[in-house]
Amino acid sequence: MNLKGRDWLMTQDWSVDEIETALDLADQLKADFRGGVPTLHLAHKTAFLIFFDKSTRTRNSFEAGMTQLGGHAHFLDPSKIYTPALEGKEVAYSTERVSDVARVLDRMGQAIAIRCYGDPVDWEYGGANALLHEFAKWSDIPILNMEDDMYHPFQALADVLTVKEKFGTFKGTKFVMSWAYSPSVHKPRAVPQSAIIGASMLGCDTVLCRPPEMALDPEVIAACEKYAEMNGSTFEVSHDFMGAAEGAHVVYSRNWVTPEAYQDGEFHFRFFRFAVFVEFDNHIRNITPH
């Protein structure tokens, strides 16, 4: 199996065997680093990190990871450079076409990691994902998705690694992805969509629990159903949180809204009626302690 040079844009691009190999390698690297074993596998390598959006955990985990592996993470603030833009969306003296940025950076570094969603693409669902794919088209080095408006594959990889560490297996593990309240309507679907894909792909019994109005991408749901059938596991969508949480090994609460809400000013006010959808004091009793 050769994973060298591969992009990591969405989990579905990789096979189950490839993801399990990545998880095994992550296990080994964590053990080596904690045990004082040198892990300088990326000595003299550079990863360019382009953050169109704010980040605490993702940025610092990427920077720390590159340091631990002996390389350097070079942070690029799009407001301090000519902002990468798709063809037809350029602004004179402000942006630079993605095709040019990608080809310049791939001559200087070994990977380009990008976070982009929301305002930089006018909250157009799929716009940021298209930008990352444009980078992949023009770059000869790996393009890594640090979250776009559709997927957050590295977060999903960390999530399923945690499941593996805690339970040792995915088979028979009930993984519940639950919508949770937030006063902001500017929350992309990337995290929940990648989480349920990762859990379903690796064989968890996966439940998506949400209000009827908070549907995820139909293509993501179809992918989860396919993986569940392939693994002999289950995937279901529920609007009953109390029922969904019963017997769960993992309950993952996260807020998201549908793309239509980004453009609907009145939605913010209707949104508040879901504020009590998750009542932690009640539902915690239904979660099996592990």
Where are each of the predicted segments found?
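Positively charged, low-complexity intrinsically disordered leader regions
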Residues: 1-60, 64, 151
